[in-house]
UniProtKB/Swiss-Prot annotation:
Interacts with GyrB. The lineage of its organism: Bacteria, Pseudomonadati, Pseudomonadota, Alphaproteobacteria, Hyphomicrobiales. The keyword Metal-binding applies. Inhibits all the catalytic activities of DNA gyrase by preventing its interaction with DNA. Acts by binding directly to the C-terminal domain of GyrB, which probably disrupts DNA binding by the gyrase. Gene3D superfamilies: Erythroid Transcription Factor GATA-1, subunit A (3.30.50.10). This is DNA gyrase inhibitor YacG. Belongs to the DNA gyrase inhibitor YacG family. Keywords: Metal-binding, Zinc. Binds 1 zinc ion. NCBIfam families: PRK01343.1 (NF002362). Zn(2+) binds at C10, C13, C25, C29. InterPro entries: DNA_gyrase_inhibitor_YacG, Znf_NHR/GATA. Signal peptide: none annotated.
Length: 57
């Protein structure tokens, strides 16, 4: 049986990803990534909270 999608490297360690932890290779790498999001290491750029557009008035 052919795999549903091509194997990609784990974004944390570079090992081949597994179906159970996709796109990661293991629950450990999955948890490392989650911790980085929760601790603020990863952020999505945007306007600071409370800043209003000048065109909204």
């Amino acid at each position: 049986m052919a795999p549903l999608r091509p194997t990609r490297p784990c974004p944390e360690c570079g090992k081949p990803s597994t179906r159970e932890a996709y796109p990661f290779c293991s629950p450990r790498c999955k948890n490392i990534d989650l911790n980085r999001w929760l601790s603020g290491s990863y952020v999505i750029a945007g306007k600071p909270l409370g800043e209003e557009d000048e065109n909204d008035s």
